[in-house]
Amino acid sequence: MVRALRVTCARQHNSDCSFMIVCTLALMTLASIGNPIFPGDYADPELHLFQGKYYVYPTYSAAYDKQTFFDCFSSEDLREWKKHSRILDFKDVAWSTNRAAWAPSVIERDGMFYMYFSAGDGAGIGVAKSAHPEGPFQDVLGKPLVKEYINGAQPIDAMAFIDDDGQAYLYYGGWKHCNVVKLKRNMVETEGQFKEVTPENYVEGPFMLKRGGKYYFMWSEGGWTNSSYGVAYAIADSPLGPFVRKSHILDGNPEVGTGAGHHSVLKLPRTDEYVICYHRRPPKSTLRDNRVTCIDKLIFKENGEIEPVVITREGVLPWPAIKK
């Protein structure tokens, strides 16, 4: 997909039309980024804008015993991505059981970057810290931040969110239950009660977005190993809910990709446009761990509701990152 632009040459008697060639080359840079956005089996991607670059923090999609680390990827335009290997390695996280490194969530506060991660298929949710968005990250507590199965929620799939008033929250949960708990200013301790906020059909992968004073709570539902996987959302007036299921917004397409889910959303800088970053399986793939990271448009209607996402092979147009 290429954006259509009308270009008029100001030089009427230039046989080689060098000006038009330059314009054509400029238009070529507007070609879509293409999906998947980088090679390799990666799932559960969280997309951010930090320090003038886009960052994607995914799960390495493989057998649990091979999931012993986290990589991340950075880009200045959503098109060209640089891999940062092993930004956190479970050999340095003694309590992790050295397996099942899942669903990292990264957030910036006071010049530091905090990563909340799942370990050991339910061993707990940890928190690691770095001075740089590309790491390396180091485990802060030497133990899980969340270990117990509270309100029936498996301690996996954390998502950190800071509201406009500065209050930080941690959403998390598998096994069809979701909790939210406040984080202290230091970002490595919880405070207060764990509140269950499970909406209808919730399975895992919570994500929170604030837009226009409303709280858009999103999650994955269905089975992650098959084509039933997808994303739904709710709208609330508070980060604590209640979250009443609105509709399904992300599904697979057998011609493009299946099992589309476990996503994140980002507003592009200097625009009112949003993108959704998610994983899916290539068409006709039946391999459990063959999941790839993609980006497509997320469109809000005038009434604030979200349109169903159209998943594509082309993806979105490149867009330059800027420092916040």
Annotate the PLM regions.
Residues 3-6, 11:
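Basic polycationic patches enriched in arginine
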